[in-house]
Amino acid sequence: MYDISGWKHVFKLDPNKELSDEHLEMICESGTDAVIVGGSDGVTIDNVLHMLVSIRRYAVPCVLEVSDVEAITPGFDFYYIPSVLNSRKVEWVTGVHHEALKEFGDIMDWDEIFMEGYCVLNPEAKVAQLTEAKCDVTEDDVIAYARLADKLLRLPIFYLEYSGTYGDVELVKNVKAELKQAKLYYGGGISNAEQAKEMAQYADTVVVGNIIYDDIKSALKTVKAVKGE
């Protein structure tokens, strides 16, 4: 079994986006610590299975970030369950999770399942619009969400999600200083090695996503930048 607490760099692949076999091989053999499969829309059991089978040709750990209960399938090493703490809709905080537990609770392997406390900070992002996230928040608000995830809910992961735009480094630094047991994931807008390295100073795990589809060479350079190898 893999230890997620040591992961510094992960790639996130959207099953609803096209990725060539050649580029997938580059991603999986890049030295990244893991590949997360997940997206905000168009996620189906068919494209999740296609992605799973493709990634399983390689030795890299593989995680399904669950956004749709209908697209859950066995075969992943781990399952990340996001709870959008700054959502205005209870279904994205605990509602969908309750339905999933009602349907699948008896057969879940709890050693494979990790809950993520999300704080979505880009109002233009699909995930913000889907979950009706309250993005017009102060730093004090974000710190409070971090404390909620870390100290009150005791979640293993607190995820700062800027999704498509590069975030506030000082905020990431201050959030990290608040966390005692939760690991800090940062995702959003990383388009080059320098940005990845900058966020890696404070985030425990840097998530690289969209740049994979725009500039594969720049995406691959983020691995070494984060891991310092």
Swiss-Prot record:
Signal peptide: none
Lipid biosynthesis found in the keyword field: yes
Domain of life: Bacteria
GO molecular function ontology, one term from the record: magnesium ion binding
GO BP terms: glycerophospholipid biosynthetic process
Record-linked Gene3D superfamilies: FMN-linked oxidoreductases
Pathway as given in its UniProt record: Membrane lipid metabolism; glycerophospholipid metabolism
Cofactor: Mg(2+)
Residue sites binding sn-glycerol 1-phosphate per the record: 12, 159-164, 189, 209-210
EC number of this enzyme: 2.5.1.n9
Assigned keywords, A-Z: Lipid biosynthesis, Lipid metabolism, Magnesium, Metal-binding, Phospholipid biosynthesis, Phospholipid metabolism, Transferase
Residue numbers binding Mg(2+): 14, 40
Reactions accelerated catalytically: sn-glycerol 1-phosphate + all-trans-heptaprenyl diphosphate = 3-heptaprenyl-sn-glycero-1-phosphate + diphosphate
Function according to Swiss-Prot or TrEMBL: Prenyltransferase that catalyzes in vivo the transfer of the heptaprenyl moiety of heptaprenyl pyrophosphate (HepPP; 35 carbon atoms) to the C3 hydroxyl of sn-glycerol-1-phosphate (G1P), producing heptaprenylglyceryl phosphate (HepGP). This reaction is an ether-bond-formation step in the biosynthesis of archaea-type G1P-based membrane lipids found in Bacillales.
Protein name, UniProt field: Heptaprenylglyceryl phosphate synthase
Species of origin: Bacillus cereus (strain B4264)
